[in-house]
């Protein structure tokens, strides 16, 4: 009888550490979500939720959003800073600014803004990094504090739109990223009769560690050097507009894993702030940018997929460093701003889809090679016998290496025409048989076994063909080796019988999830319950709410997935709302300037030319349905 428990499942998939308490596993072995931490007793089973959506006509894959998680993340971050401000007697306040580049979906932005609708003084603003984003936030920022921060490269039109935002009642901070922007801002402000609110992005010497570390340091794409900062100060003094400089901004990069890097960046930027104040500037806001990390792998480490600090520690470090510096230099304490988009959005979205097929190794009975067989085959047969005879633990490693060497020789001889196809097939099957036997007798308790066990897991892993596009739904997994938690949505009440790798349905060998979160850290395979064609086998990809949608591409013309907003009411009842259909085939063809209407005319011509009259209507109907259909697989039975 198995001693497997739900606790083992939590450990095996490291759920307690990457989920922030928002996702869990029920006693029935199904993955759950608790979208409203104020009511942790109210949970949603993701497996049943997906089945209900399919019954209602929502085809998989589907991206499911939980807006209550967005509300929780906003308020948690604001509360962390508010408590730190109280703890250190910091003499100013905190503003959370959401950079919409992280996820520009209307539902996401509106839910973030709605999270503080009941607050007398909302602590929310919006950030734009381009003209399209600015046009969006100009129409939405009034739902919160009306604070807008404008980053990125700016032309005259961008700058004029930002200044017009002031006329619309917003507080718009135009952050100077390049020295040349200052002249344009001042000229256009005079034309419009607007007093601009200026910000400076300073280029720090300090550079944090991580995948986005190029955002900081002396060679960073954006920001002003110390000399350029002085140039701006002198230019503003000459124009008698030094009071317009109201914000200091820096950015170490997204996903800063080490809290020491954050402290170092705040400390250096704090010195800039104090020096600017001494020069007569009136900087009122200190914007630390992004960097607040998400613990994707749950290791609480300095890994680029993790973080070695918590939310309280993050806020305490920023507040305490700037508090001490301002007191030391007798300077007023500025309003603190952070642009923490990844932290706000990552957890709120889950991609749910189905496994449409598998390829698994099953041991086959093999006959012993005859006397005339190549020596390599005889060696492999003998090695298998040694495993079956339970060789000592260190000898198992040698057996594995010997078999791999023999197999490599078989492949070489086959390529040279010195070995038959049947011999090669036998050798490959025997290799898998030996690996299968070795995996059964080797143990992770022996340190010297572990590297080989990892190799065996990879060699023997089942292939799960999953109905999604890695390039569309998890582009960072492909592009920068970002890790996302992956879990089967059911069957977790039993010990996993297999290990598997997830393959998407694109015609690209890169469409493979290469890294998986488990209790041992990051692995190349995922423990899974056995697959059965008798019932749907659903997979969840978690923490996909930040960047993935907008970065996703249309490789093989797989388009946007279906999406749905799911909310719990006060009684714990599930409401599926705002279901948005994903791209149809016609939609993605139009995106690459292919005209579905003209295609239909061509189909009609070809049908009339090649198809018998009694079949034409049915064929044309199928072609039309194909153009209107979902880009993902809908019927694979």
UniProtKB/Swiss-Prot annotation:
Pathways involved: Amine and polyamine biosynthesis; agmatine biosynthesis; agmatine from L-arginine: step 1/1
What does the UniProt keyword field contain? Decarboxylase, Lyase, Magnesium, Metal-binding, Polyamine biosynthesis, Pyridoxal phosphate, Spermidine biosynthesis
Question: What catalytic reaction does the record list?
Answer: L-arginine + H(+) = agmatine + CO2
An individual GO BP term: arginine catabolic process
Q: What is its EC number?
A: 4.1.1.19
Does the entry feature the keyword rRNA-binding, yes or no?
no
Database matches in CDD domains:
PLPDE_III_ADC
Q: Which cofactor does it need?
A: Mg(2+); pyridoxal 5'-phosphate
UniProt cross-references to Pfam families, sorted A to Z? Arg_decarb_HB, Arg_decarbox_C, Orn_Arg_deC_N
Gene Ontology molecular functions: arginine decarboxylase activity; metal ion binding
Q: What does this protein do?
A: Catalyzes the biosynthesis of agmatine from arginine.
Q: Which family does it belong to?
A: Belongs to the Orn/Lys/Arg decarboxylase class-II family. SpeA subfamily.
Q: What is this protein called?
A: Biosynthetic arginine decarboxylase
The organism encoding this protein is Shewanella loihica (strain ATCC BAA-1088 / PV-4)
